[in-house]
Amino acid sequence: MIDNCILDEQIFDHYVYQKEYLLLAVPKSYSVNTRLQEYQIPIETIHDGSFLSPEVLSVPLNSFANEPFIILRSDNDTGKRALTICQENNFTPHTIFRLDQQMTAYNIACSGMGITFIGDLLLASAPATSELIFYKLPGKNCNRNVSFYWKKGRYISRAMEEFLKIALPQ
């Protein structure tokens, strides 16, 4: 199994696959974007990872305090982190949708209905859009590990060993 949350180490073994960084995806039609142009990051910098440079500024998140948000459910790691990040930036998001999946939130944001939090790994494989503007988020809660998990004590097949050798960075 692959997941972006921490599972019980008493039950599961894991290998870290890679880091994922959450970003803010804002419909381009929102007027708040005009005041925050210096913080906007092109999708190309997300794809190549250069947005992680310290020179790329994190957006003052409370600038979006009065905007509608699409937030994942609180039992979802992305949903928990989104609420924590907003709390750390001194506001509670005006939530118009509570969803289960990042891809659904992304598609609704593309339609212009609200702002959402999205992982850079998903953006790497999502259909390209010109309907969203992306922003780097402040704080430590915007990054997490994505890991391969399996139950402790279970047999690891030769095929699984070879897959992990290929998939995991050396």
Each PLM stretch: what is its role?
Residues M1-I43, I133-Y135:
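Short beta-strand-centered segments that line the small-molecule binding cleft or hinge
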Residues D13, P68, T92-T95, I133:
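Conserved beta-strand segments of alpha/beta enzyme cores
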Residues D13-V16, E38, P60-N62, Q87, ...:
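Short secondary-structure boundary/capping segments
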Residues E20, N66-E67, N89, S111-G112, ...:
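Structured helix-beta-strand junction loops
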Residues V32-N33, Y39-N89, I156-R158:
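Secondary-structure junction motif
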Residues S74-S130:
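Hydrophobic hinge/microswitch elements
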Residues D120-L122, E131-Q170:
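A late-sequence structural motif
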